Amino acid sequence: MFNIRVMRMGQGVEWALHACHLLAALPPGSSLSSGQLAEFFALPAPYLSKHLQALSRAGITASVPGPQGGYRLARSPGEISLLAVVEAIDGSASAFRCTEIRQRGPASLPQSSYRHPCAIASAMARAEAAWRRELEAVTVADIMATVGRRAPAAASVARTWLARAVGANPELGETGGPADSALPPERN
C-alpha cells in the first residue's frame, strides 16, 4: 500500500565497500577482474559484478577492457567517501518518507492548522543528515588506515594475495606505489 523503505543498507553496500578497499591497494596500472574480487571475498561473481558496474556508473571504479582487464579505482582512495559508495549501490533516496498521517483520521484538523513540519519527520531528517555527514566524512583511505592498525596480519595477507593476483612479487617489493601505503605493513 505505502512505499515504505527501511533504513537498512543492502548487502551490496558491504560488498562494494570491501571491493573498493581491496582495489585501493592495487599496484599502479593494475586491475582485478570481478571474478578475482569474488574469489577474494568468497562471493557470487554475478552479483558482485552487478555492484561493480554500479560503482563504475558512479565514477568510483573504472572498467579496464581486455584480457588482463578488470576494475580499478577511478579516483584516489582519499577522494571516495563511504557515502558515495552507499549511494552508488543503494541510491540517494531518503530513508524516511513522511506521508502526513497526522492529517488523517478522526483527530485531523483543517490543513491550515499544520503550519510546522511533522515533528517525527523532522527528527528523522536530522538523524539521516547526521548519518550522511558521518559517511561523507570517512573515505576509503580512512578505512585502509584503520584496517592497517586494527588488523595488520589481514593487511599483509591481502598484500600478498594482490601481488600474486596481478603477477608481482611481494618479496622483491614489486607491488610498490599505492599498494604499500594502502595496506600498511604489519606492526604493533
Where is each model-derived feature located?
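Short, intrinsically disordered or compositionally biased N-terminal tails of bacterial proteins
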Residues: M1-M7, N188
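Short amphipathic alpha-helical elements of helix-turn-helix/winged-helix folds
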Residues: A19-L26, A88
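Short helix-capping/hinge SLiMs at alpha-helix to coil transitions
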Residues: A25-G29, R75-S76
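A short alpha-helical element within helix-turn-helix/winged-helix DNA-binding domains
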Residues: S31-A42
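Canonical helix-turn-helix DNA-binding module
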Residues: A42-T61
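C-terminal regulatory/oligomerization modules of transcriptional regulators
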Residues: C98-N188
